[in-house]
Amino acid sequence: KVRTDAAGAPLKDGDRVAGAFAYDRDTGEFILFKAKAVVLATGGIGRAFLVTSNSWEYTGDGHALAYHAGAELVDMEFVQFHPTGMMWPPSVRGILVTEGVRGEGGILKNSEGKRFMFDDIPPLYQGSTADTPEEGWRYVIGDREARRPPELLTRDHVARKIVKEVKEGRGSPHGGAFLDIAWVKEKIKDSEAHIKKKLPSMYHQFKELAGIDITKEPMEVGPTTHYVMGGIKVDGDTQMCTTVPGLFAAGECGGGLHGANRLGGNSLSDLLVFGKRA
């Protein structure tokens, strides 16, 4: 197995890709691969943004390589932002804060302590969104007659609401909002044990990386670049064949499968199915 960084474009013989040229990070050597097909599985473009949940290698290299080889890119304007990424300290900025926090009753507040998500519920979702905090809490604890709290609206809407609060001067100290799960002590007798049981990874993540005890104080969160729906144009049937013979794309670097706004969890089935096919 050779760990490489892509260097230059895939090699072509006429109109067809016939191999690739790479750089071995461990030895410093250049390597020439001759192949009947090249499969790009380079992930997304998250690291092109200042704040992202993506790994360090998600720099869009595959997109650039495919483009220079003559492939088409599609839907690159469709970028998904997860509304809750860590905001502080700088070393953890962008790391994902699971939607499970809001699912267990976490609420979003601005610097004035106001729960702002009730202020602007899109008409499309008004019929399925709680009118009051009381109804929202009933939904959290399993009341089937209650509607969901506004913190559980779509990712794009929640992200825009946080950005709006920041732009209007009501953001948290480091450019986000406060996500508070500790408030459930008003509803649950032994809230500290409850939070640790329901959200163990989040408890340890904030305790170890940010020095925050989420059972006692709010988390500082903000939008983080999470996924790009666009990418290298692939065939609609196989979701792998690009517009260049011999060049294939699998996973997030391929575009079009998820439309304009990917549904949560679908990227996992995407990469498993088309990664296996590749």
Where are the regions that the model predicts?
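A glycine-rich dinucleotide-binding beta-alpha-beta segment and adjacent secondary-structure elements
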Residues: K1-R16, Y23, H194-G256
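Core beta-strand elements of the Rossmann-like FAD/NAD(P) dinucleotide-binding domain
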Residues: D26-A37, T242-G246
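Glycine-rich loop(s) and the adjacent beta-strand/alpha-helix scaffold that form part
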Residues: A37-I95, G127, N266-R277
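An anion/pyrophosphate-binding glycine-rich loop and adjacent beta-alpha core
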Residues: E72-E208
